[in-house]
Amino acid sequence: MFFNKKYFWAIIFLGIIFSACGYRFSGEGNIPSNVKSIFIKIFENRTGETGVESLFTNDLIYEFTRDRKVVLRSSDKADAILTGVIKNMRIRTVSRENSQTPLERRVQFAVDLKLTDPNGSVIWSVNGVSANEEYNVAPDNNKHVTEQNRRVATAALSKRLAEKVYNDLTADF
């Protein structure tokens, strides 16, 4: 024989285990079957960062359109409405050259989300979903370069958080 019986049974056993335990890749779930279309309302921004609500909302819309599991519609035609609040944005120093000279900082967002039906009944909600991204502080205290690094980190963070929210939303159903 070309294969060993031990390997054959091991493969069969693993196949049964993975198919039986609901194993799936992140984001491969579905929102409820009665939700065929969704409206994503621009998120409320409770941070001091201007424009972060548009950035995050657009990144979240991209995640839904990329996957094509549901159609995006206007609020009056959608089966569900996704709303949310960007609660906070924190920036903390994570490494230093000395007590006065930061080398790297971390930006963090936290969001609350709610998916409701057109009547306002909550289908899904979660609070405090967060992610973070590090960025370099420019040498010689060059504020322009540091600010640019922070903006790039904020954009990367927004994309990653939108992906995380999408995966969390679809994994629950």
Listing of model-derived features with the role each one plays in the protein:
Residues F2-F3, F18-Y62, D67-K77, S121, ...:
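A structural "domain/chain start" motif
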Residues W9-A20:
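Bacterial N-terminal signal peptides
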Residues M1-W9:
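Bacterial N-terminal signal peptides that target proteins for export
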Residues D67-R68, I81-G128, N132-N149, E163:
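Surface-exposed short loop/turn segments
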Residues T146-S158:
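Individual transmembrane alpha-helices with interfacial aromatic-anchor signatures
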Residues A10, G29, R73, Q100-P102:
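Residues embedded in well-ordered secondary-structure elements
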